[in-house]
Regions:
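Catalytic cores of glycan-processing enzymes that make or break glycosidic bonds
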Residues: 1-654
Length: 654
């Protein structure tokens, strides 16, 4: 879809599709709900709707854990709109089951559990899939031919259909646990399709129908003058059709993570191979997205500049490093006076025998079996090939001993990144090897590390420019980037050069290096940006104002309010939203919870109940929030709509 070039700054609303509720939707928001949301949005002056990813994640509630970079999630299907015959009683029975579950006694609203109004994802998906299978049995021959024609123009769907069938036949286990077909090549996939096409074609037909529904919804939004903004995660689940069938696109030796120790578990890309293919897989992915979206958000855009790569044998990310990066070579270390023995001392974890016995007691011998002895000394060190954290976890050591061993294995000044190449570890200045160096040796190594960082930053700029330029080649969609966190110096310039919008979140848009860390004035937000009040991984605006930002004098100052002003409740929400509306950002898009909070009656009593996700946690409440107000109710909430019209007019009049 082509992004409409508005002549004014735009107001948008951000809402997970799953969170929308209408009389026709069945337990979760559906593609067919988007036009009704769009009509309400247009009536109050909202011109953009942003949703989270809608790819198939199976029974995983996180929309960022996709089984396919291309396939749509069946959970968003509007069953009543399928031309295929369905037993009306089946749909009514599922609706009744979901209603009864919501009324079940004992379901109390808590931060960590599913509240009565939240999505019961497993039940919804299982029920819909059961009904969809019965519909498939009634599909007309003419429609199957149409689906076959559609499949020829969507070659990804064949491998996805095979993957889905095999996953079902293997009790939904990851492909790495299958007894057969774990490592198919193209010939294997072709033979497998011929053998299993009749069974697998259900998923082809289903994707064809889902694309029909999503395309129709997107086109209706277009006719309303409301742009649809999608979300394209940079990373793909290991247990996905893409990795299973197109292994060469990925570097399975590493998982993506972050320098603070988070291991996200997603394989990183093999950019060299993708480049040799002219980024075919990525171009296909973007073309698929362009069928539905006028604009799209690049999740974790920093990963296109550099990614924190974690060896696959670790479950933490402390032994990770940025790829690409300029390596420290053995020759450079030798030139500084470090011989082979001292390079080994710096690049492997070492364990004095007395330390092992003191820490591990009777289990010290088990630890020593995983290590290698240094000559005949009472000194041990990690092997060239390990142990990594997963090997330690699988050892017969007690839980306490394993927990004590993990940080010791990370005690390396240098990490090996290849034959005769290294990089400094994340916390190298606190390692045993570093603390043993002389002052001059530390200065020399720091100088070398800084020079390598300077070269790496040039590599990151080159990588980001090349990859993001590829993603901008079509030019019809508006491209926005999630550029939060510690960013390399080159990122803002590359985004500006390519016309990609960055992200400005009020609570994190501060001058962190200055005393009192003042907020960046709203008037200083760049034009090429999306301004927002909160994101799906944060508290809501109302929750932030009542918690972290309570009595924040710097916030009051940037809002131009008196020091005794009360920012709690709807008054604080209104003050922040109005300030953001006056920012020069091309787009200001707010979570629907923050817009509803303009009117106290439209929100839950506890703002924590409206959180989408709490990062780093696995709990039933994550990704299951659902609006308590239906789409049918929105147009008659006159106080809310009047407040939104007034808010949106601030942008239109700029």
């Amino acid at each position: 879809m082509k992004y409409p070039h508005f002549r004014h700054t735009v107001t948008g609303v951000v809402v997970p599709l799953s969170a929308i509720k209408s009389r026709k939707s069945l337990g979760i928001g559906e593609f067919a709900d988007l036009p009704m949301l769009g009509r309400w949005a247009a009536s109050v002056g909202i011109e953009l709707i942003q949703i989270l990813p809608v790819n198939d994640t199976g029974f995983e509630t996180s929309p960022y854990s996709a089984l396919s970079a291309f396939a749509l999630h069946p959970v968003y299907a509007r069953l009543d709109d399928f031309p295929e015959a369905a037993n009306p009683g089946d749909i009514a029975a599922l609706r009744s089951e979901l209603k009864n579950r919501r009324k079940k006694p004992g379901t109390v609203s808590t931060v960590s559990g599913i509240t009565p109004g939240n999505i019961n994802f497993d039940t919804v998906l299982a029920g819909k899939m059961r009904i969809l299978r019965s519909m498939w049995k009634t599909a007309a021959a003419a429609d199957i031919k149409k689906a076959e024609k559609w499949a020829k123009n969507n070659p990804w769907v064949q491998n996805y259909a095979l993957f889905s069938l095999l996953k079902e036949e293997n009790e939904l286990k990851s492909w790495v646990e299958w007894k057969e077909f774990r490592n198919p090549d193209r010939k294997d996939l072709s033979r497998l399709w011929k053998k299993k096409k009749d069974k697998a074609f259900f998923w082809v037909w289903l994707q064809w129908r889902l694309e029909e529904q999503f395309t129709a919804a997107s086109r209706e939004l277009d006719s309303l003058g409301v742009a649809l903004k999608g979300d394209i995660p940079i990373l793909i689940n290991e247990d996905s059709a893409d990795l299973w069938a197109e292994r060469d696109n990925f570097n399975q030796e590493f998982r993506a993570g972050s320098p603070d120790g988070q291991n996200w578990g997603f394989p990183i890309y093999n950019w060299e191979y993708l480049r040799s293919e002219d980024y075919r897989w990525w171009r296909d992915r973007l073309n698929q997205a362009a069928k539905f979206y006028h604009a799209w958000r690049i999740d974790h855009v920093l990963g296109f500049f550099r990614i924190w790569a974690v060896p696959k044998g670790d479950f933490s990310a402390w032994n990770g490093y940025f790829k690409p990066s300029a390596p420290v070579t053995r020759a450079e270390l030798e030139a500084l006076g470090f011989d082979t023995g001292r390079i080994t001392w710096l690049s492997r974890a070492h364990f004095p025998g007395n330390e092992l016995r003191e820490i591990f007691g009777d289990e010290a011998g088990l630890v020593q079996k995983m290590l290698e002895q240094v000559g005949s000394e009472d000194l041990w060190r990690s092997r060239p090939d390990g142990p990594d954290e997963k090997e330690a976890a699988a050892s017969p050591l007690s839980v306490e001993a394993r927990e004590a061993l993990y940080p010791l294995l990370r005690n390396k000044t240098l990490l090996s990144t290849g034959e005769d190449s290294f990089t400094p570890s994340r916390n190298y200045q606190s390692t045993r090897g570093w603390l043993s160096l002389t002052g001059d040796e530390k200065l020399n190594l720091k100088d070398l590390f800084q020079r390598k960082l300077n070269v790496s930053e040039s590599l990151w700029e080159q990588s980001g420019r090349e990859l993001l330029s590829m993603m901008k080649t079509d030019g019809s969609m508006l491209v926005c980037a999630e550029d939060l966190g510690a960013i390399p110096p080159s990122v803002p310039g590359v985004l500006q050069e390519l016309g990609i919008l960055g992200l400005k979140v009020t609570r994190w848009s501060r001058k962190w290096d200055e005393p009192s860390q003042p907020y960046i004035p709203f008037s200083d937000y760049p034009e090429l940006s999306v301004a927002t009040s909160s994101v799906h991984d944060s508290t809501t605006l109302r929750g932030w104002l009542a918690g972290e930002a309570f009595e924040d004098k710097e916030l009051l100052k940037v809002l131009g309010l008196k020091e005794d002003a009360d920012l709690s409740g709807s008054a604080g929400v209104k003050a922040v939203l109005e300030a953001l509306q006056k920012a020069p950002s091309m787009v200001a898009a707010y979570p629907i919870q923050d817009l509803l909070a303009l009117i106290p009656d439209c929100v839950s009593e506890n703002p924590e109940d409206e959180r989408i996700n709490i990062p780093g946690t696995v709990q039933p409440g994550n990704w299951t929030w659902r609006m308590k107000i239906s789409l049918e109710e929105l147009p008659v909430l006159h106080n809310l709509n009047n407040a939104l019209k007034e808010l949106c007019s601030l942008r239109r009049n700029q």
